């Protein structure tokens, strides 16, 4: 639902499809190939902390899809390369942003909860003021459109000078490695 709201309100987000896992896997593959192309990101609709998230090529798509068989619905979206930027919003105010440079392919579960994964946190984000204000404003707009309260963290990719909102987290982590507390302590 959130992606439909983003698209309706002209917030860039990757093209996506949602499937019920009971569908024939080869039919899913054909639809993904036709409407999205590869690579893609597959993930369960109802998980967090990057649990069950895979970046897939044509070659490993079905193999990774089978790993998600315990989930009823699967979100499949076009993979957007680029820089990972996270934005925190608190009580309808722009709290700040952080860039992540994971050693792994993306900021996955291990990178989020294990300091030895070696993800580099860059704060302040190294973009010009105009782009920083733009990404903060997009995150605030998404927060308000979804009628969120309290704190949210929006995950973006910055690619070819455009921000793509991947998702908005309504219950961002608050551990020692979590991003919202780090953003708050900087700002």
What positions do the PLM features span?
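Active-site nucleotide/adenylate-binding loops and adjacent lid/helix of ATP-dependent enzymes
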Residues: 1-82
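ATP-dependent carboxylate activation and anion-phosphoryl transfer catalytic cores
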Residues: 10, 128-187
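Generic secondary-structure signature for well-ordered alpha-helical cores
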Residues: 11, 37, 70, 102, ...
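A short acidic/small-residue loop/turn micro-motif
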Residues: 21, 102-103, 171-173
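Short, flexible turn/loop "capping" segments at secondary-structure junctions
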Residues: 44-46, 115-116, 176
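Short small-residue beta-strand/loop micro-motif enriched in glycine and branched aliphatics
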Residues: 50, 119-122, 176-180
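Phosphate-binding site of ATP-dependent enzymes
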Residues: 57-134, 158-164
